[in-house]
Amino acid sequence: MSNRGAYFVANDAILDLAIAFLNSFRAHNPSIPLCLVPFGDDVGGIAALAGEYDFSVWRDQARLGWCDDISRRFHGHAVGQYRKLAIWDGPFDEFVYIDTDTVVLSDIGFAFRLLDRFDFLTSHSDLPDIRRWVWKDSVYAAGALSRRQVSYSANTGFVVSRKPALTPASVEARLPAALALAEHMELSCYEQPLLNYLIVTAGGEYGSLLGVAAATGSWRIPLERWAGDRSLSVRDGRVVGSRTPSLLMHWAGEWARARATGRQIPYVELWEHYRRLREPVG
């Protein structure tokens, strides 16, 4: 078996979110190795939880600096989300990456088996409603990518891959072409357009959990739920009433919306369940 593990990116600014994530991850994945990739330098609070939640802390500052340099070329300043690129040069041969604005609702071990068929696997892809969060309409006229490459447009909050699939050298080699497409990228989504570009131009097999389920009819594959979908029901730390198992709940965009409107996030009771999971009762 390959050296397998999972990564998450966080800092102390999102400590509450990180605790909810960690509680949920360890509730369903008690033994898989886990590594924190620092979003920035302010990680003292979350790093102090490493013993309680059994995770390591990324130490290769040079590789994080490399990620920051890439983000500056797209945004003019360092953007912590780009540190996700470091994981292809990390300690795990095969790995899962999960965004921290999630709660994990199942064992993620099944995802590694899909690396027999794929070099890159995300949660969702090939949905027209997602494409606008990766590429602007103008990308088609640019002619640099095929329609299939553009339509892949994956949510990169959940990624399964292996080390050789995206080496730092291969990223460097394709950066000039990626930068040439920057005006066609939805850079308000930070690293997501670049990572999509790197995935679809890597020469490997790429897909998504949703795509695998649809192609094979295997609807027992756990799938991501988006908190913006108001049709879901939750109870006792679970999503209930769905015909497919739930992999995780993702509040992508919903925390920012809640802050802007002064309202609670959707399914706050699910998030609170995991945020308070290890707190003493009474």
Across the structure, where does each feature detected by a protein language model lie?
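Short internal beta-strands
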Residues: 34-40, 123-124
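N-proximal low-complexity "stem/linker" segments adjacent to membrane-targeting elements
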Residues: 1-23
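Conserved catalytic core of nucleotide-sugar-dependent glycosyltransferases
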Residues: 113-177
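Active-site-proximal specificity loops/subdomain of glycosyltransferases
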Residues: 45-90
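GT-A fold catalytic core of metal-dependent nucleotide-sugar glycosyltransferases
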Residues: 82-132
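Short, charged/polar "capping" segments at the starts of alpha-helices
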Residues: 16, 41-47
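A glycosyltransferase accessory/donor-loop signature
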Residues: 1-4, 155, 163, 168-282
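Short, acidic, metal-binding catalytic loop of nucleotide-sugar glycosyltransferases
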Residues: 24-32
